[in-house]
Design a protein with these regions (language model features):
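Acidic, metal/ion-coordinating pockets
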Residues: 1-263
Length: 263
């Protein structure tokens, strides 16, 4: 199949702190060139010191070549982001959050003269943030846009792989790809489901290999041993980028290939 017939989307796992940001800033351009990327999506909810995102960080990510920023339960950790979420079309918060909260949960953009949608949804199993039922919510959005958009990517920010896999099969044949985020641990279950939807339980993270999900191992261990919640810190060395490249048919939105990447 010719390049003109496909869309290649690079979707990157949760960016952790300054180390993760620097890794993106220095490597995104070369990654896009290597894989001939048409659309770059990153989860940015941990980019500000490990918790939240600021307008300045978001703008710098866009300048670096990111097209869409997704988030999750930490999106409001930085108060400065609230107003920005209403102004910037291409930064998302989970669509199934309360309607009273700032921001929006999906966007539509043009890629190769075709409309492409990115939807951000949060799970509810094992999550403390109260959300609307993700299955009911995503179905409403997909039904609303499906007649005008064939290529749809979903960031499902959730704790439970049971819920994530169920979500993938729920959307099988309705969307191009379902990628899990939140745990910061990359899974090796990437595949194309039988009705043409690309799936992976978790993208992993853009964070340090010498860490506990991007954070200081000593502090994490101390908290577990002493049964207390401690203020943690990100680890900035040996940072890797984890994610996937999904190749899909330009006209039908059907996924053709999903490939894990780690750089």
């Amino acid at each position: 199949m010719q390049d003109n017939d496909v869309i290649r989307a690079l979707i990157i796992g949760d960016i952790i702190g300054d180390g993760g940001l620097k890794k993106i800033f220095f490597n995104l351009k070369s990654l896009k060139e290597k894989y001939n990327i048409d659309l770059a999506i990153v989860n940015g909810e941990n980019s500000s010191g490990g918790f939240g995102i600021t307008p300045e960080i978001a703008e710098n990510l866009f300048k670096a070549g990111v097209n869409v920023i997704t988030t999750g339960n930490h999106v409001y950790a930085e108060s400065s982001i609230r107003e920005y979420l209403d102004k910037q079309e291409y930064i998302l918060r989970p669509n199934n959050f309360s309607d009273l909260l700032e921001g929006h949960g999906y966007c539509i953009l043009n890629v190769k003269n075709e409309k492409v949608a990115v939807i951000n949804i949060q799970g509810f199993l094992g999550m403390t943030f109260i959300v609307k039922n993700p299955f009911e919510n995503i179905k409403k959005v997909v039904n609303m846009i499906r007649n005008k958009v064939k290529t749809i990517f979903v960031d499902f920010h959730a704790e439970s792989n049971y819920e994530k896999e169920s979500f993938g099969y729920f959307l099988n044949g309705l969307v191009t790809g379902v990628v899990g985020t939140h745990t910061h641990i990359m899974t090796q279950d990437e595949r194309i489901l039988d009705k043409g939807t690309a799936y992976i339980s978790d993208l992993g993270m853009t964070g340090s290999l010498n860490s506990v999900i991007g954070f200081n191992p000593e502090i994490s261990l101390k908290g577990l041993l002493e049964y207390v919640a401690l203020r943690t810190e990100t680890v900035e060395d040996d940072v890797i980028i984890q994610g996937v490249v999904i190749t899909s048919h330009l006209k039908t939105g059907r996924a053709l290939k999903i490939e894990r990447i780690q750089k």
